[in-house]
Amino acid sequence: MTESKGPDTPGGSAAPKKKRKTLLDRMRPYAIGVMAMVVVFGVSAVIGAHVRGKKDTKVSEPTGAVAAAQRPTAAPTDGASPSPTAAGPKLAIPVKPSAPVTVTVYEDLRSPDSKAFQEEYGAVFKQLLATGQVQFQYRLVTASDKSYGGTGALVAANAAACAQDQSRFTDFVDQVWKNQPTDPKDDGLASEKLMKKLAAKAGKIKTASFDPCIEQLDHEGWVDKSQQDFAAAGYGDVPVVEINGTVVKDVHTSLTPAKLRSQILKEAKRVVTLRTAPTNTPALAG
């Protein structure tokens, strides 16, 4: 009996059987594809984190920001102006600029003390603005984030700077005060959704530019710089008030709206007197 060699093939040998793919062989192309996607997304995340890290250090000043005012100390000579001069980084938001007296208010949008101060002194501030002799500069700080944890003060301050880009700082901050959590440990102001809602309530804020500004924290570096400058000055707790660069005493104890108004008007009178004082320039001989 002869041995069967199967179907006839050249040379009389049997055709090799096709090897069957295992489950691992069938899954290998998909596994490679998934791994490639993981690598791509991983690299993207690293790049994004790197860009975000770089962005945090950039000081992007909001539109109209100004440097700190300094106290006029002498009558004008040789063309020098007795008006408050400015120096240093532009960390203040001015309200009604170009006045003989500059009142600077350091405030933390998450701080109940800052909110209480604005509620108590807001009416007097409006009266003083109406005189045309006073401008206000607001410095936003974030000490409450360090005290209680979270980022509510930072997010709110950045959003206020975004509103300032559209000349809506005061209107937006008014909404922040109205919606500030009663407990400073509550980090509710860290919500981007809330910031967008407050912008809508403030009115006349274009979402096309405001929303990306808060989502990307465009002014985060500026807010951080303001806080660093405030901490380095050793002012203590907010609120802090300056009149032409001089710190007002007893803000947390015996100061009242009437007393502050009196101090501001006294400084305005002093500056006006400096402006009208005769110079020491000798008269030319006829």
Regions found by a protein language model. Name each.
Residues 171, 193-194, 209, 259:
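An acidic, carboxylate-rich microenvironment
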Residues 100, 156, 237-238:
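A structure-centric signal for secondary-structure junctions around beta-strands
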Residues 56-123, 127-132, 138-140, 269-286:
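Extracytoplasmic low-complexity, Pro/Thr/Ser/Ala/Gly-rich segments
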Residues 1, 178-182, 244:
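Short regulatory "switch" loops immediately downstream of catalytic or recognition motifs
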Residues 109, 115-193, 279:
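Structural alpha/beta surface segment adjacent to cysteine/selenocysteine redox centers
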Residues 2-59, 200-286:
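C-terminal cap of thioredoxin/glutaredoxin-like
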